[in-house]
């Protein structure tokens, strides 16, 4: 099992709507994330910079890359596109973060 982190960017003024949509995450999306191997998934907001920091665990042999090919993931990205920075394909712009410290 490995832990990864990445950063995304929320548009200013979209905090409450972002939280509302995630509080009502579609069950089929949650199932797809779990089926891809994602667990212990957290997203934090830095309100000063509008950066979202995501941290999750995934096993060796995870299927996260295949999520982009699923209908539910594409629909979620389209649903969230008005709230955050996205690429030409509609997926959120993500920046991988380097681990600097870990205390177990």
UniProtKB/Swiss-Prot annotation:
Its main location: cytoplasm. This is L-rhamnose mutarotase. It comes from Burkholderia ambifaria (strain ATCC BAA-244 / DSM 16087 / CCUG 44356 / LMG 19182 / AMMD). The active site is at residue 22. Pfam families: rhaM. Homodimer. Belongs to the rhamnose mutarotase family. Keywords: Carbohydrate metabolism, Cytoplasm, Isomerase, Rhamnose metabolism. The keyword Ribosomal protein does not apply. One of its GO terms (molecular function) is L-rhamnose mutarotase activity. The keyword Cytoplasm applies. One of its GO terms (biological process) is rhamnose catabolic process. Involved in the anomeric conversion of L-rhamnose. One of its GO terms (cellular component) is cytoplasm. It is found in: Cytoplasm.
């Amino acid at each position: 099992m490995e832990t990864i982190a990445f950063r995304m960017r929320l548009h200013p003024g979209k905090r409450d709507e972002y939280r509302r949509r995630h509080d009502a995450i579609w069950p089929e999306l949650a199932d797809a994330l779990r089926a891809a191997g994602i667990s212990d998934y957290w997203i934090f907001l830095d309100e000063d910079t509008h950066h979202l920091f995501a941290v999750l665990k995934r096993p060796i042999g995870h299927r996260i890359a295949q999520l982009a090919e699923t209908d539910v993931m594409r629909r979620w990205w389209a649903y969230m596109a008005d709230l955050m920075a996205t690429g030409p394909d509609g997926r959120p712009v993500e920046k991988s973060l380097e681990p600097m410290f870990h205390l177990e």
